Structures are given as C-alpha cells and as structure tokens.
Amino acid sequence: MKLFKLLTVLTLFGLAFVMIRPEQPIDFNSIYKVPSESPKSRKKWDAKRLLDANGNIPQSIRRKELKFAQSLPNDLNNSNLLWTAEGPYNVGGRTRALAYDVTDENTLIAGGASGGIWRSTNLGQSWSKMTKPFQLHNVTCLTQDTRPGKENIWYYGTGELAGNSASGGGAYFDGNGIYKSIDNGLSWDTISSFTSDNNAAGSFNVFDFAWNIVLDPTNLDEDEGYLATYGGIYRSIDGFNTLSLEIGGGDAYYNNVEITSTGVVYATLSSDGADKGFWRSADGMEWANIMPDSFGNTYGRTAIGINPSDENEIYFLTAETTNSGQFTNTFFNGETWTSLWKYTYLCGDGTDSCGTWVNLSQNIPANRPTTFDNFNAQGGYDLLVKVKPDEPNVVFIGGTNLWRSTDGFTSDTNTAQIGGYYEGSD
C-alpha cells in the first residue's frame, strides 16, 4: 500500500504533463532563458518604477500592500456576497512542489509557482488552500522533516525563475525567502532572516529564487538542510535561520540539490556559473566535482534521481546540453539537446576511478513520428527523473511527456510514453 501511494504521488506530479492538448498549443519557446536576460537588471528596472520620493522602496511595502488589500472587500460592502467556484477544474497549473506526509500517506501537500500551498487529507480527492491572501503564493520547492518527532515541520522555498508566463521568459516571479510550518502544513510563516522586505532599492536577493530545498534525516542534533538558489548551494544547521554558501557565488542560473537517506548530498550548477558541474559531499562541507569529462561544455537545468534501493546509483537528466547528448526536433519548429547519465559511487570522494559513469543519452525518446512525441524539456521548464523504489530498472523521465523505461534507459526499445501529449499528435 505504501509503494502504491508513493507511485500515486509520482503520477500526480506528472499530471502537469497529462492534461496538455495540442489543439491549441502554447509556444513555450519564448520561455527559454537567453544570454541577454538578467534577473539583476530586471530587479533594478522594477526598482526605478517603485521608488518613493526619497529614492527607496518602503520597507515591507509588498506585505503592507497585501494586508491593505484584505480590507477592500469590507470597504466595498461586498462581505455578504456569496461566491461559487465554477472552474475550470481540470487544469493543475505549474505545480513545482508535491510531497506526502510520512506519518499519513493520505495527506498530500502541493505548491504552485503562482498558486500557493494546497493540502489534501484524502489522497488528492479534495484540496484546501493553506496560503493566506496576504502571503506570496510563489512556491517552488517543498520538504518535510522526516526525523522522529519532527514530522510536523515543513519548509518551502519561493520564487519562479524559469518564467511563469506563456509569452515571455522574463516574466519570472520573485519569492520572499523560505517559509516554515510547525503544524503539519496547516499554517505557514516566513523565516525572517532571508525575506526581501529590508532589501535596498534595486538589490538582488538570491533567496527570492529557490530551486530546491532538502533536509538531512541523519543529523539528529541539528536542523541541517540545503537550499539551491540562483547562484549557488547553501547549507544550514539551524532550520534555515542562518545559511552558508557551500558552492557557487556566481551567476549559475539553474541549480539543484538532493540528499540520500544516509546524508550524502548531490548538487548541480549550470554551466553559466563559476562552480559549474555535478558535485558530491558526504558531510555538506567538503565537496568534490564528479562531472564526467566527456559531458559537454554547455548545459542548463539538471534533475537528479537517486535510486532508493541503491543510493550509490544516481541519474542526472540535463536540459540544453548544446551539441552533446540526444538531439530532438520539437514542436513550433524548435530543436533541443538533452543528456541522461547514470553515476555509480564506488569509493572515496567519488571522483575519477571512485565513480563510474554511463551515458544513456542516446536512449532518450527522439525521431518519433511527430515532434510532439519526442522528448522535450522546454529548456528545462519541465524536467523530471525518478527511480521506482522496488524496481531499480524502472526509471521515469519527464518533459512535455512522461516516459517509463523498464531497463533503466539502457536501450530505446523498452520505453513507453505514459503521459503528456496524445501520441501521434501533430
């Protein structure tokens, strides 16, 4: 039953792909990050529009704005109006975060890039919104503290950096640091240390753009966790009240972090940063770059898939590996390169002969009857790799479609499309 519910969560996570229909396709090509884009420049441009007479953005102005908005319905005497939701009900939006409660697998918590936190206690049959109207709704990552006695604690990161608009990749959503719940997801508050309320005008807060957040289940004495943001990977030992930069410090745009059940940390930074590559650490402080020499020089966002039945095996699925990996033609007359590698840790720090790599990129679905049938991560906008807990050869990869391989993508003959566009769409 536990395995079934785990797979149900995986299936729900893939629903963002399932409901896509090609009759009126959205052009996501404009979402792709181009070299001229700069979050820092956009931040300064926004600041010029929002400065007060003294040349400052008033402290906590966004929070005050939302609080003021709460009073508007009362002032307009609309409190007696009754509203009924009329739909649509079959559109999940951009769900960046989803997890089930380890103490009750019927309880699911999901987070949307512009829709806030939602909670279900009946395995997704119905949902309740937990984010308050005066809070920012830009949820991008979510994690639960699974240590005994700590399961009521959850964290989520904020800020959609990949773009949340069908018409422009520059339309990213700023977040406001990290949020924490101590009542199993029923209510949430910001961790004030890293909110952007006190930012100087035009300043850039990397904690406004979180890619992923994970906790160390083995550290019983400290609240140890890791956060992947724009620019780098951060570590905390006090529940994200303070953070230290472990890798990065430059302009790496797409970054990720995952952790094994034994506390081994894997991180990835895109090629536009100084500390680019794939990294491994046994303690979160000493890091080794384990990236294979033949990987290629250009790469964007990477999804990390740890094999639960053998955590020495990790899959890395990377988007926009220009001139390296698998080439595919995509809809809207586009084209892309994607790479899939499998890493096996053997000894020591995992580098050189202490780790082996297998390039599985040639088995990524390509050259299908129509471009909608080919693998397409849309520049990393949608990217997923997961391993089935009790069958390590069953591996899932997701882009605009969701694919299932029964031989770990060691061939292209044992792969089936299980979600996304209707096969044969044109």
Where are these regions (language model features)?
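Extracellular glycan-interacting surfaces
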Residues: 4-426
